Amino acid sequence: MIGDYHVHTKFSSDCNSEPEELIKKAISLGMNEICFTDHVDFDYPPENGQTIFRINTKEYFNTLAALRDSYKNRIKIKIGIELGLNPSIEEMNSSFVKSNDFDFVIGSSHIINGNDPYYPEFWEGKSIKEAVMSYFEAILRNVTTYENYDVYGHLDYIRRYIPDKEYVYVENDFYEITEMIFKNIIFLSL
């Protein structure tokens, strides 16, 4: 089986792709399955006064269910979500997952202490090592708080946005905390 379970569409604030175009591309690449996992981050700070990373779940499900039916003989289509995790919104996230019939849930950490590492403000006032450690500490809190996800997404998200391109990321600097993260993730899957 060849598939992709981390696919964003126009339903995510960071993507403009039409779901049907992505389905056609997946078929052309020989994929058997595709799972749409658009972003929902309830605690993402508004941009220019606009709430982002929220979806209209009814429209999302209706659109993807219709496409699933149209392409059922060519590719298996699943409806999932990439959910931004944070202990302060655990109840809201859990309720959201339970009230929707997602086939697959990616848990991710995008917001750490109110900031996304994508933005320069996240990095201000701390060393790169301190900032990266705060990211892993947030993930550890999330994996010990949450159970309503199938896989944890892009643990290396922070590495994309390290502002100093000369910085050498040394995995052993974060060995202990990443070891605890992995043990919690593995325990959850048992």
Question: Model features per residue range: what roles?
Answer:
Residues 1-87, 92, 96-97, 159-162, ...:
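An N-terminally biased module of ancient metal coordination in phosphate/nucleic-acid-related enzymes
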Residues 13, 99-102, 106-190:
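Domain-core and long-helix interface of multi-subunit machines
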